[in-house]
């Protein structure tokens, strides 16, 4: 493009007209205005290319397709197609969709750019674009080509590369906002061709440059029988603008795009654009409309404010800040979600640790409960009175007392016991030695108890007295064999019969005296030892508590046994001491 012409186009204030004029210059340079959309579909969308529409085309394949396309255009318009048109068009498409220089281009974006810059009407272009991008829904009641949100988003993204090529990407609105405006009020996931055509014909801001470019091309050679009020040019060529507030105020294309105005006409006044010549009836209607706006200025101001607000909404749609706010909220929600997930994970770990501790505590509680039950059974077994009841102990005590009183030896009995001992010294065994020993001990205890009625043995514990009374006869019995052995050792050997009777009598008398002395000494020592053992066995502390009153019968029985043994020992020991 000529730099001077490019600078002139950059001086246009309105971004939509500036973009449209630049694209019109590119269209004219590449001679794409000589090609219609049907020819493009015939060449680029044939079966060989259409099967690979989702894949990439090499630059050589696209160059051959463009050569064929312009060859057919040359046949329809002989002498108008420049030989370098295919080369310039290939360079244009490569710059738009192959910026990385890979050598491959997508078929659908290239075809969409050719259709958009073709010389067809906007309605034909919209239909061709819908057929190019729509997806066929198979089966169902409403089968046919449909366009989903994803497909519409891809179409608008591909078309945005066209104004970006001429450096006018800032004048476009976001793709997401345009997609929401198209699907506003639509409940289905896809739209049909009628809905798509009605939306694009409403001239959305993202595609506003496309119909403007078509109007510029259509009005390029049109003349209007009117004079420009600002530059006084007659006739007006190209677009004609007429003020709806100033009476008979016409503006040419150059003055309008340059932003010129007069004292009576301001930039804020509403104007109407004409790309074709107006008839007399249209001029009359426009005159009455101007008069109404001047007479009803309040109504005119309201309509102008509404029109300007509508234009502002189109240029700066409300969905943009809402969309940004929604994205911010979504980001914050994701952050909160991550935090809550981390908190939930930590709480789960704590719960697992608590459950493990609770399980351990339950196990310890069960083991402690088992131990307590065992201790309880042991205590019950220990607290229960062992052996027979107290009544049986009372009977045993009465029997022992009766037997001790009956078996107390008197003077003659003591001589009998002494004679029995002497008989045992001659070599004969002692008859019923255990019974005699038991009778001696019971008699001795009885006499000792009578002489010492306030002895400490009166407060013996039942269970310990019982055990000591059971062990006492065993001690006495164990001592008797040693006593018998001593007696047997003291028995002298039999003297021979050859000794004389006087000498034998003297010897026997002497030996009998010695034997008697030894026997008395041994008996005294044995009895004293038995007495000391018996006193040690019954030297116990008296228990205190409620059990003492319960076991008094057992204590009394033990006391009687102690008295009987003491009396028996005294009865045996006192004659020897004398």
UniProtKB/Swiss-Prot annotation:
Residues 399-410, 431-451 have a biased composition (Basic and acidic residues). InterPro entries: EF-hand-dom_pair, EF-hand_dom_typ1, EF-hand_dom_typ2, KCMF1/Dystrophin, Znf_ZZ, Znf_ZZ_sf. Residues 322-351, 503-537 form a coiled coil. Pfam families: EF-hand_2 (PF09068), EF-hand_3 (PF09069), ZZ (PF00569). Zn(2+) 2 binds at residues 243, 246, 265, 269. Keywords: Cell membrane, Coiled coil, Membrane, Metal-binding, Zinc, Zinc-finger. It comes from the Eukaryota. SUPFAM superfamilies: EF-hand (SSF47473), RING/U-box (SSF57850). Zn(2+) 1 binds at residues 228, 231, 252, 255. GO terms for cellular component: plasma membrane; synapse. It is found in: Cell membrane. GO terms for molecular function: zinc ion binding. Residues 382-475 are annotated as: Disordered. A zinc finger (ZZ-type) spans 223-279. PROSITE patterns: ZF_ZZ_1 (PS01357), ZF_ZZ_2 (PS50135). Its main location: membrane. One of its GO terms (biological process) is synaptic signaling. PANTHER family: DYSTROTELIN, E3 UBIQUITIN-PROTEIN LIGASE KCMF1. This is Dystrotelin.
């Amino acid at each position: 493009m000529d730099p001077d012409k490019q600078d002139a186009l950059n001086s246009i204030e309105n971004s939509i007209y500036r973009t449209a004029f630049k694209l019109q210059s590119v269209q004219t340079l590449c001679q794409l205005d000589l090609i219609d959309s049907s020819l493009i579909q015939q060449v680029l969308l044939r079966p060989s290319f259409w099967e690979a529409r989702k894949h990439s085309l090499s630059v050589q394949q696209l160059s051959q397709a463009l050569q064929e396309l312009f060859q057919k255009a040359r046949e329809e318009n002989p002498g108008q197609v420049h030989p370098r048109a295919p080369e310039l068009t290939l360079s244009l498409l490569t710059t738009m969709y192959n910026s990385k220089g890979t050598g491959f281009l997508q078929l659908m974006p290239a075809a969409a750019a050719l259709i958009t810059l073709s010389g067809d009407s906007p309605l034909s272009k919209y239909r061709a674009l819908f057929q190019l991008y729509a997806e066929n829904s198979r089966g169902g009641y409403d089968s046919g080509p449909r366009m989903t949100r994803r497909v519409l988003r891809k179409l608008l993204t591909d078309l945005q590369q066209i104004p970006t090529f001429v450096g006018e990407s800032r004048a476009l609105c976001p793709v997401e906002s345009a997609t929401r405006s198209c699907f506003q009020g639509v409940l289905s996931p896809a739209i049909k061709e009628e809905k798509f055509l009605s939306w694009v014909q409403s001239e959305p801001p993202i595609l506003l440059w496309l119909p403007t470019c078509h109007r510029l091309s259509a009005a390029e050679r049109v003349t209007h029988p009117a004079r420009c009020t600002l530059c006084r040019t007659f006739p007006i060529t190209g677009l004609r603008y007429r003020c709806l507030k100033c009476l008979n105020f016409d503006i040419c294309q150059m003055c309008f795009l340059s932003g010129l105005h007069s004292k009576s006409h301001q930039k804020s006044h509403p104007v109407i654009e004409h790309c074709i010549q107006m008839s007399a009836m249209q001029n009359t209607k426009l005159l009455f409309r101007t008069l109404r706006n001047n007479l009803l200025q309040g109504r005119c101001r309201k309509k102008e404010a509404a029109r300007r607000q509508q234009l502002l909404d189109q240029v700066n749609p409300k969905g943009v800040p809402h969309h940004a706010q929604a994205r911010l909220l979504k980001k914050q929600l994701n952050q909160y979600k991550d935090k809550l997930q981390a908190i939930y994970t930590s709480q789960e770990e704590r719960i697992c640790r608590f459950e493990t501790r609770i399980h351990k505590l339950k196990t310890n509680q069960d083991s402690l409960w088992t131990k307590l039950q065992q201790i309880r059974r042991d205590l019950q077994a220990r607290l229960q009175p062992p052996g027979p009841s107290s009544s049986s102990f009372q009977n045993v005590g009465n029997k022992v007392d009766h037997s001790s009183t009956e078996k107390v030896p008197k003077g003659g009995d003591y001589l009998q016991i002494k004679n029995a001992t002497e008989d045992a010294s001659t070599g004969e065994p002692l008859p019923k030695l255990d019974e005699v020993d038991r009778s001696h001990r019971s008699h001795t205890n009885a006499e000792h108890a009578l002489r010492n009625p306030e002895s400490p043995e009166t407060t013996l514990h039942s269970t310990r007295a019982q055990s000591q009374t059971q062990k006492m006869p065993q001690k006495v019995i164990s001592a008797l064999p040693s006593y018998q052995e001593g007696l047997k050792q003291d028995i002298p050997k039999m003297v021979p019969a050859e000794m004389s009777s006087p000498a034998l009598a003297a010897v026997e008398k002497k030996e009998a005296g010695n034997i008697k002395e030894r026997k008395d000494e041994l008996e005294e020592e044995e009895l004293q030892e038995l007495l000391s053992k018996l006193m040690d066995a019954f030297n116990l502390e008296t228990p205190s508590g409620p059990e003492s009153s319960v076991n008094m019968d057992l204590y009394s029985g033990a006391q009687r046994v102690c008295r009987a043994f003491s009396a028996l020992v005294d009865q045996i020991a006192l004659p020897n001491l004398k």
